Amino acid sequence: MEGRGGSRGGAMARGGGRGGFGGGRGGFGGGDRGGRGGGRGGFGGGDRGGRGGFGGGRGGRGGFGGGDRGGRGGARGGRGGARGGKPAAGGKPGAKVIVEKHPRHEGVFIVRGKEESLATLNSVPGESVYGEKRVSVGEGEDKKEYRIWNPFRSKIAAGLHRGVDEIHIKPGSKVLYIGAASGTTISHVSDIVGPTGVVYGIELSHRPGRDLIGMAKKRTNVIPIIEDARHPQKYRMLIGMVDVVFADVAQPNQAQIVAQNSAYFLKNEGHFIISIKASCIDSTAPTEVVVQNEITKLKKEKLRPQHLLKTLDPYERNHSLVIGVYRKFGSSEK
């Protein structure tokens, strides 16, 4: 079904071209492959990205420790496309789009028009957080507004574009987000978890912390906490048990930070997602060695990696994404 519109985003990175949904999917240790093409990389430098379609080719699935390359490419459109309507504020009249539910990630949508993008249903219609484009569909009481999720501004969105299978964040989820910054990604997580979920955002720096607090004033399911994530005991009375811990702190002791916060707040069999920037941990060692060392540290803390996305290129340079499960009462894996 068709809709119209899409407001013009003012805060996109300069030179931030479009990466595709053709990213391959590898198992733990498998080689993920990016999309095809030559879109320029934004935010973070001059990587050249891939411009792929949503219907990327299928490849073999790599298992934990396997070396198979490939995997399924971009997401295929599912049922439940949104109805057509008027353009969002600032949108171009006549720009037809189709909004569909993502087939694998609940609470995430695919917007198809001149460009193909991921989006979340805006829980604060009429408001953008970081200048992102917005698309409105439907009429009257059926009108809905979607916010385009920019993969050059969000590690989770980059992972979704690269074909990650599961982020474990869905409507009703309780999420602890370590390294919240000004709230760009948290705002989309807020959209996904909805009114029955909650997002706790930990940020140490006061300047982005002010932006985070300002965003949270309009999103009642976001709880900003301006504190040092290395000392979770300082905010233990503010946070309940959570389903997912996400960490994007780029610190040498990142694995320890995740382990400490998981011990306090992550429920047994809950999940974690860690964005690893190898150069921030050890700039002298090869990226693969640094990532494997971090994985070893996580295993010793009962954090069992299940999926490794070796690269987030072209969206984020020198970043990997590790997703796994917390076995609180199991023995540590050496």
Swiss-Prot record:
Subcellular location: Nucleus, Nucleolus
Keywords of the record: Methylation, Methyltransferase, Nucleus, Ribonucleoprotein, RNA-binding, rRNA processing, S-adenosyl-L-methionine, Transferase
EC assignment: 2.1.1.-
Record PTM text: By homology to other fibrillarins, some or all of the N-terminal domain arginines are modified to asymmetric dimethylarginine (DMA).
InterPro entries in the record: Fibrillarin, SAM-dependent_MTases_sf
Pfam families: Fibrillarin
First-level EC class: transferase
Gene Ontology terms for molecular function: histone H2AQ104 methyltransferase activity; RNA binding; rRNA methyltransferase activity
Domain of life from the UniProt record: Eukaryota
Record GO biological process: box C/D sno(s)RNA 3'-end processing; ribosomal small subunit biogenesis; rRNA methylation; sno(s)RNA metabolic process
Compositionally biased spans, kind Gly residues: 1-93
Residue numbers spanned by region Disordered: 1-94
SMART domains, A to Z: Fibrillarin
Free-text function comment from the UniProt entry: S-adenosyl-L-methionine-dependent methyltransferase that has the ability to methylate both RNAs and proteins. Involved in pre-rRNA processing. Utilizes the methyl donor S-adenosyl-L-methionine to catalyze the site-specific 2'-hydroxyl methylation of ribose moieties in pre-ribosomal RNA. Site specificity is provided by a guide RNA that base pairs with the substrate. Methylation occurs at a characteristic distance from the sequence involved in base pairing with the guide RNA.
Family designation: Belongs to the methyltransferase superfamily. Fibrillarin family.
Assembly notes: Component of box C/D small nucleolar ribonucleoprotein (snoRNP) particles. It is associated with the U3, U8 and U13 small nuclear RNAs. Part of the small subunit (SSU) processome, composed of more than 70 proteins and the RNA chaperone small nucleolar RNA (snoRNA) U3.
The name this protein goes by in its record: rRNA 2'-O-methyltransferase fibrillarin
